[in-house]
């Protein structure tokens, strides 16, 4: 069986990380006119909801950009062939914590803006998946070290 070359996939993933970063920046700007449209179109969406939505978005930006940075570093490590390394486990841990922070922020705003409950659910589920992958990586590192010593 030939070894796979995932350089193309890693490059696409890195490009998508940067695209998502750009989209977050666009959303940071677009939330102002978008919230005005929502107040006109949805009768249940008032000025207080618009402020809460903006606060929620800007608070979630901090873990969001940290998450994107960690994903980019992780992809660079994978491109270099550094897969089962403790620094990748740390990056995965930070990524999962960022997901959980976004989940908590959206849950806090959920009683007022119900649709943020779906965002909270998605962020929490993503955090759980990344946390499980982190646990797999952390178990694989000692196994790899033991295998390296055996060979």
Stretches found by the model and what they are:
Residues 22-35, 127:
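Alpha-helical transmembrane segments of multi-pass membrane proteins
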Residues 17-28, 64-70, 100-106:
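Helical transmembrane-bundle signal
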Residues 112-124:
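Short, aromatic-rich membrane-interface segments at the entry and exit
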Residues 71-78, 129-151:
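Cytosolic juxtamembrane helix at the C-terminal end of the final transmembrane segment
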Residues 90-115:
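Hydrophobic alpha-helical transmembrane segments of integral membrane proteins
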Residues 65-86:
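Membrane-helix interface/capping segments
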Residues 29-61:
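Membrane-helix boundary elements
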Residues 1-27:
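Cytosolic juxtamembrane helix and N-cap/initiation of the first transmembrane helix
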